[in-house]
From Swiss-Prot:
The keyword Nucleotide-binding applies. Homodimer. SMART domains: CoA_binding. Optimum temperature is 77 degrees Celsius. Keywords: ATP-binding, Ligase, Nucleotide-binding. InterPro entries: AcCoA-synth-alpha (IPR014089), Acyl-CoA_Synth/Transferase (IPR051538), ATP-grasp (IPR011761), ATP_grasp_subdomain_1 (IPR013815), CoA-bd (IPR003781), NAD(P)-bd_dom_sf (IPR036291), Succ_CoA_lig_flav_dom (IPR032875), Succinyl-CoA_synth-like (IPR016102). SUPFAM superfamilies: Glutathione synthetase ATP-binding domain-like (SSF56059), NAD(P)-binding Rossmann-fold domains (SSF51735), Succinyl-CoA synthetase domains (SSF52210). Pfam families: ATP-grasp_5 (PF13549), CoA_binding_2 (PF13380), Succ_CoA_lig (PF13607). Catalyzes the reversible formation of acetate and ATP from acetyl-CoA by using ADP and phosphate. Can use other substrates such as propionyl-CoA and butyryl-CoA, but not phenylacetyl-CoA. Seems to be involved primarily in the conversion of acetyl-CoA to acetate. Participates in the degradation of branched-chain amino acids via branched-chain-acyl-CoA esters. It catalyses: acetate + ATP + CoA = acetyl-CoA + ADP + phosphate. The keyword GTP-binding does not apply. This is Acetate--CoA ligase [ADP-forming] I.
Amino acid sequence: MERLFYPKVVAVIGASPQEGKVGNTIMKNLRNFSGTVYAVNPKYREILGFPCYPSVLKIPENVDLAIIVVPAKLVPKAVEECGRKDVEGAVVISAGFKEAGIEGAKLERELVEVAERYGVKLVGPNCLGMINTEIAMNATFSRVAPEKGRIAFLSQSGAFILAVLEWSKRNGVGFSKVVSLGNKAMLDESDFLEYLAKDDSTDVILIYMEGVEDGRKFMRVAKSVARRKPVVVMKAGKSQSGAKAASSHTGSLAGSYEAYRAAFRQSGVIEASSVEELFDFALLLLKYRKAGNLAILTNSGGPGVMAADACDQFGVPLANFNFETIRKLKEFLPAESNFYNPVDILGDASAERFSRSLQILSEDENVDIVLTILTPTAQMDFLKAAESVVGKNAVCCFMGGESVDESERILRSSGIPNFFDPVRAVRAISVLGRYSKISAKERVKEDLDVSVEREKAEEIIEKLLESGGRVVGAEGLPVLEAYGIEVAPYGIARNVDEARDIAESIGYPVVLKVVSPDVVHKSDVGGVKLNVGENDLEKAFFEILSNVEGRMPKARIEGVLVQKMVDGGKELIVGMKRDPQFGPMIMFGMGGVYVEVLKDVSFRIAPITRREAHEMVREVKAYRILRGLRGEKPADIDAIADLLLRVSKLSLDHPEVLEMDLNPVKVFESGYAVVDFRMVLGEEV
């Protein structure tokens, strides 16, 4: 990777003297490169003052990096020649690969085979190129070269990079490295993250992501990197239409957005919901890393109140000043001022009043960072105010237009972010708390307190698969029991006499449910009877059979589940779905028939730790209900966490289990019981 970012000799294969051609723009962009540049084009001997050769093989010295801009069908041959020349890396700008359809995908596979054969590291294809500002290497066809900075930017979209580079020029944002990933035929986000973690010129890493192909690799790498440097991701393709567009854009597998969110959370990656957030977070994290208590200092009550409200919205704690701070403020501020947080120094405040107040707040041991909000009054000298902010732990919200331009330049040169909107400023500050609390810390491996019977579960699953079972219900409950998961007492009856024997064994009242691989929602077809007593059992048994046969005549009925009626408790859902990119994804939420409407659920990628299991429970809105409301007894949270851990382990041990729904699970003051269950079996995704 070092040669990709720090080449001494670069060859542009497909260089052109013709204005407007990509090969021409790249040659122009490399004029300031600190190394040597060669053009490759059989038609010319010189392009823009650079020596030109008919093939990379003819260049009279070793080449470290090739930039390839020839038509797609010629790219494999160009990479083969690079391999024969011992070129270590190639950036393939050319489009027309897997993003273009079946033939393009075939060509991309051929390209990768050639690169692997010769050990050439590929960036792209279908990308904008790469930038390393440290050595003035702009190997892209962007018209704008970014300023030097401490932000590295990885993006699947080249066009997005073009827009960002222009914006960054206007806003004084610099970059260390910029990489357009394109189709990621060989090198992907994870590979570049590993390199950038060790890059001394990079402090913050930003990623525009449409999808990853190896989600577990990304999690493993991101978790390691995020412990050292903030990683902020903007994920596109969240909706079905967005995912479809992402797929057609770079051939990405967008996967489940819930899986990505869970992966980011577990890896310590900060997710930005917009371009604005992406760079707001980056600018804050460049300057500060420590989360803490915020003081608000303003010359206008309204914006101060906006900021205080935003603190509540985004979870930013407001500082409680010590008595000495309040005493010092009262010594010189007008009596009408507000001496508490937010501090309002009034609309007639001068820069001197502002500066003195800021100094006092900065000296308070309870204050970690100050948000300074100033509006353009006749009394306020923004230049002096900006100078007093330099050197302080502060974020500015200098509200105005031309009157704040010069002061903004002073702030920018010191790396102090300035926002027009107080709410946006607080939202940006909130990232400091998020970064300090991320779950990127080393996770301790936790063993289950009770061992599981993996081989027993494996035998049951094999028998179910041999019998042709794909969607499995009650007959799969022994799999749960093998993993120590508590199931309400039950039995499966093939006739009414068996049903009666089971009911007498487990005790009345009971629940009867149809057992059929074709019936998913049993209550919708009359396949469930609740609170069945001894005298009602026979009638209920035959009513279930009649109801299902009448409403789903083609359904295969394999029996009737007879289960102990479980009263009381709160209904939960625990589930697992195997994501194509990330593997088993564990779900938790409030259960029952309304789960699809309420969608009060949380997700994690397996394996999960006990701490993460508890986090999943706390994240749902209904957590307060589980804690106990209005004198109700609290639910057994530890038992729920244990259940989640067991489902996580089951999903990892048995890749042929594609999906599981434990719904509902009844949880009590002590313990829980799985009441209904569905499992989908098949080949691993």
